[in-house]
Amino acid sequence: MTRVKRGNVSRKRHKKVLNLTKGFRGAASLLFRTANQQNMKALRYSYANRRKKKRNFRRLWITRVNAAIRAYGFNYSEFLYVLKNSNILLNRKILAQLAICDPDTFFKFIMSIQ
């Protein structure tokens, strides 16, 4: 049987994984096997959290709009119902930005749709 030399290939593979796990704590950044496991787990988390990020931002926008609306005696669901019926196509992100950055304009906007 002929000899198979794999030193360079595995060293490059190990180095690649260890570079990806820089900044991890303990053995997760020093030992190849644990680093490889942590790297795979981190990639799974990053994949899942890219999808969760969209949900979380939507929740944040809804919370912000709801808090701003309640100051003027509205309910969030009633407010959205009025928006839909008056064919106003502002999304939750824009409404939240208006409520936070420009409350005067937001107040005028609410009074105009009442």
Swiss-Prot record:
Record InterPro entries: Ribosomal_bL20, RIBOSOMAL_L20_CS, Ribosomal_protein_bL20_C
Pfam families, A to Z: Ribosomal_L20
Keyword flag Ribonucleoprotein: yes
UniProt-annotated location(s): Plastid, Chloroplast
Swiss-Prot/TrEMBL keywords: Chloroplast, Plastid, Ribonucleoprotein, Ribosomal protein, RNA-binding, rRNA-binding
PROSITE patterns: RIBOSOMAL_L20
A single MF term (Gene Ontology): rRNA binding
Top-rank taxon, per record: Eukaryota
Name used for this protein in its record: Large ribosomal subunit protein bL20c
Source organism of the structure: Tetradesmus obliquus (Green alga)
Taxon lineage: Eukaryota, Viridiplantae, Chlorophyta, core chlorophytes, Chlorophyceae
UniProt gene name: rpl20
